Structure formats: structure tokens, C-alpha cells
Amino acid sequence: MQLFVRAQELHTLEVTGQETVAQIKAHVASLEGIAPEDQVVLLAGTPLEDEATLGQCGVEALTTLEVAGRMLGG
């Protein structure tokens, strides 16, 4: 299935739904140079856990995930 990932740019990924959020972060890191530990992946504004698979998170075909950078400070 296709998945859209919006970071600094919009990327289209081909996934099975069995990938973990951590694997998506690693892929975004290779595309955009943002370290995985500095990324927050959001589905409809809700942060996703690294260990969860896309299927467990409710990600369906043609879903758009947002990738935000962690903010320093508080």
C-alpha cells in the first residue's frame, strides 16, 4: 500500500503495514537527514510509538503521516 509522509517535503512510501514506526523514522532519516530520535511521527495529530506497527496504529492505504522535529527546551 502507498503511504504519504510529510516532513520537510512530501514523500510517497510503498509499505505493507507490518513496518514499525521506528522503521519509518529510519527511512525519513535517510531521505531528509533528520535523526530518528529527533522525529515525532503523528497520525491525525496523535504521536505514534516507535515499537508499534503501522497496522496496529490504524494506518491505511493513502494515509498521510506527519513528521515533526522534537523541540529543545520546555
Swiss-Prot record:
SUPFAM superfamilies: Ubiquitin-like (SSF54236)
Name of the protein: Ubiquitin-like protein FUBI
Family designation: Belongs to the ubiquitin family.
InterPro entries: FUBI (IPR039415), Ubiquitin-like_dom (IPR000626), Ubiquitin-like_domsf (IPR029071), Ubiquitin_CS (IPR019954), Ubiquitin_dom (IPR019956)
Pfam families documented for this protein: ubiquitin
Other notes: This protein is synthesized with ribosomal S30 as its C-terminal extension.
SMART domains from the UniProt entry: UBQ (SM00213)
